[in-house]
Amino acid sequence: MSQQARVRLAGTSPEDLDDICADVREIANKTGVELSGPVPLPTKTLEVPSRKSPDGEGTATWEHWEMRVHKRLIDIDADERALRQLMRIQVPNDVSIEIVLED
């Protein structure tokens, strides 16, 4: 049984995540390794309520700020050429990528 690499992507822009997933799929097709995914994981919503008025006087009106964190999961066979090309993918600043080798 060959070793697997689990790639976890997280970011605030789903379009950027889909672009990186397409790059990973293209690398898998070029090198001929098996690919499973991308699996969309549940989106986390981080919400911060804040008062509109800075001095605390007047009516209590609130603004709600939110940030959504989208996640994707990809399993790929851990071929040396494929992993080297995975490391060379240009990743935007708002996307984090984590690669874990599994048996």
Swiss-Prot record:
Matches recorded under PANTHER family: 30S RIBOSOMAL PROTEIN S10 FAMILY MEMBER
Pfam families to which the protein is assigned, alphabetical: Ribosomal_S10 (PF00338)
Domain of life of the source: Archaea
Coiled coil region boundaries: none
GO molecular function: structural constituent of ribosome; tRNA binding
Keywords recorded for this protein, A-Z: Ribonucleoprotein, Ribosomal protein
InterPro entries reported in the protein's UniProt record: Ribosomal_uS10 (IPR001848), Ribosomal_uS10_CS (IPR018268), Ribosomal_uS10_dom (IPR027486), Ribosomal_uS10_dom_sf (IPR036838), Ribosomal_uS10_euk/arc (IPR005729)
Family stated for the protein in its record: Belongs to the universal ribosomal protein uS10 family.
Cellular component annotations (GO), alphabetically ordered: small ribosomal subunit
Subunit annotation: Part of the 30S ribosomal subunit.
Region (Disordered): 35-59
HAMAP family hit by this protein: Ribosomal_uS10 (MF_00508)
Purpose: Involved in the binding of tRNA to the ribosomes.
Protein name: Small ribosomal subunit protein uS10
Any GO BP annotation: translation
